[in-house]
UniProtKB/Swiss-Prot annotation:
<keyword id="KW-0694">RNA-binding</keyword>
<dbReference type="GO" id="GO:0016434">
    <property type="term" value="F:rRNA (cytosine) methyltransferase activity"/>
</dbReference>
<dbReference type="InterPro" id="IPR023542">
    <property type="entry name" value="RLMI"/>
</dbReference>
<dbReference type="InterPro" id="IPR029063">
    <property type="entry name" value="SAM-dependent_MTases_sf"/>
</dbReference>
<keyword id="KW-0963">Cytoplasm</keyword>
<dbReference type="InterPro" id="IPR041532">
    <property type="entry name" value="RlmI-like_PUA"/>
</dbReference>
<protein>
    <recommendedName>
        <fullName>Ribosomal RNA large subunit methyltransferase I</fullName>
        <ecNumber>2.1.1.191</ecNumber>
    </recommendedName>
</protein>
<keyword id="KW-0808">Transferase</keyword>
<dbReference type="InterPro" id="IPR002478">
    <property type="entry name" value="PUA"/>
</dbReference>
<dbReference type="GO" id="GO:0003723">
    <property type="term" value="F:RNA binding"/>
</dbReference>
<dbReference type="InterPro" id="IPR019614">
    <property type="entry name" value="SAM-dep_methyl-trfase"/>
</dbReference>
<comment type="similarity">
    <text>Belongs to the methyltransferase superfamily. RlmI family.</text>
</comment>
<comment type="function">
    <text>Specifically methylates the cytosine at position 1962 (m5C1962) of 23S rRNA.</text>
</comment>
<dbReference type="InterPro" id="IPR036974">
    <property type="entry name" value="PUA_sf"/>
</dbReference>
<keyword id="KW-0698">rRNA processing</keyword>
<dbReference type="GO" id="GO:0005737">
    <property type="term" value="C:cytoplasm"/>
</dbReference>
<dbReference type="InterPro" id="IPR015947">
    <property type="entry name" value="PUA-like_sf"/>
</dbReference>
């Protein structure tokens, strides 16, 4: 494409000295860095981003109501944002997932991990021949048709289902959407395979895209700690950790969640894998309340898995989230037998690994127990973190030996 035929995009001009993050290829432009917009741009429309002297820096998507005013599509001036662009990004991402799928025997994985795969605001999970799409930013929504066209080119045999029913869309003035895009409707429960387990996924009604693929490696790691042990699985959802614990030879696993639907699927997952259902207990309750009740009754466990939902959405909630993480980990530590193992996680992007480790240390002090950190976890390898976007590392966890 020549200069004369290249699309002319509106220009987002940065204030003086506010281009440094873009020069380091960070994919976000915050509102405080913006001087003005030259030309008119609709919500999500493609814009060029320039410094205060007009020097071209990047090409991105405009979002006037968001604190993140622009998300970068490309740092290559010669690259237009069109179907061919999305096709290239998809094929580049698929190369890594092909290797992983072959190596680990996967039929399900995260195909696109947003900014880390060069597609900010785009999440795509693959479950067998179903592609589950989440468009979380104005730019991603604006490019919906181009992205779907690229998906159909790259995956002609796959059905596409939209799960853009995520509250974060409201922050950029978008409605929530859900439903089939192309191809057949997913079944009520779709079986997938993970590290020797068969698991049922509720694409249409489950959390996020239906299943937490990011915890795949952590679920496998659980098996080394659970042989002949009594296990408490908190925030169990559909029982991935419970099935893995049973496959690891645990004596008993108690799964706790507030959702009866999730617990019912967890029970089905145990049965699907032909595991001993008598070793699995399913409790519908609030985890905080139940842990306190267990403490009062003198209940003890050998392994506790603590995988709560995100406690913090923005910086103003961080202090409260820290208290929540400390309280729940303190309760777990108090319920463990000497030498017991705590597998604890945080999926809050604003919670750094260092801060999370400090919270666990503080929880141990409050519980009156010594704790050794023996293993560290992060999101599975199909959720990569590009070096210029450290915020992409959102999931962190620790295996702790409680003395």
């Amino acid at each position: 494409m020549t200069e004369s035929t290249f699309p002319q995009y509106p220009r987002l001009v940065l204030s003086k000295g506010r281009e440094k993050s873009l020069l380091r290829r960070h994919p976000w432009v915050f509102s405080g860095a913006v001087s003005r917009l030259e030309g008119k741009a609709n919500l999500g429309e493609t814009i060029d981003i320039v410094d205060h002297q007009g020097k071209w820096l990047a090409r991105g998507a405009w979002s006037p109501a968001s604190q993140i005013r622009a998300r970068v599509w490309t740092f290559d001036k010669a690259e237009s944002i069109d179907i061919a662009f999305f096709t290239r990004r998809l094929r580049q991402a698929q190369q890594w997932r092909d290797w992983l799928a072959k190596k680990d025997g996967l039929d399900s994985y995260r195909l696109i991990a947003g900014e880390s795969d060069g597609l900010p605001g785009v999440t795509i999970d693959r479950f067998g021949h179903f592609l589950v799409l989440q468009l979380l930013s104005a730019g991603a929504e604006y490019q919906r048709a181009a992205l779907i066209s690229a998906l159909q080119t790259c995956y002609p045999d796959c059905a596409i289902y939209d799960r853009s029913d995520v509250a974060v869309r409201k922050k950029e003035g978008m409605a929530l959407t859900q439903g089939p895009v192309t191809g057949e409707l997913p079944p009520a429960l779709l079986p997938i395979e993970e590290h020797g387990m068969k698991l049922l996924v509720d694409i249409q009604g489950g959390h996020k895209t239906g299943y937490y693929l990011d915890q795949r490696d952590s679920r496998l790691a659980t098996r080394r700690y659970v042989e002949n042990q009594r296990v408490l699985n908190c925030f169990s959802y559909t029982g991935g950790f419970a099935v893995s614990a049973l496959m690891g030879g645990c004596r008993q696993v108690v799964s706790v969640d507030t959702s009866q639907d999730a617990l019912d699927i967890a029970r089905q997952n145990v049965e699907l894998n032909q595991l001993d259902l008598s070793k699995a207990e399913f409790v519908r309750d609030d985890v905080f309340k139940l842990l306190r009740a267990y403490r009062e009754r003198g209940e003890k466990f050998d392994v506790i898995i603590m995988d709560p939902p995100k406690f913090v959405e923005n910086k103003s909630q961080l202090m409260g989230a820290c208290r929540g993480y400390k309280d729940i980990n303190m309760l777990a530590i108090q319920l463990l037998n000497p030498g017991g193992i705590l597998l604890t996680f945080s999926c809050s992007g604003l919670m750094t690994s260092d801060l999370f480790q400090k919270i666990i240390a503080d929880a141990a002090i409050d519980a009156g127990r010594d704790v050794q950190f023996i293993e560290q976890f992060r999101q599975a390898a199909d959720h990569p973190v590009i070096a210029t976007y450290p915020e992409g590392l959102y999931l962190k966890g620790f295996a702790c030996r409680v003395m």
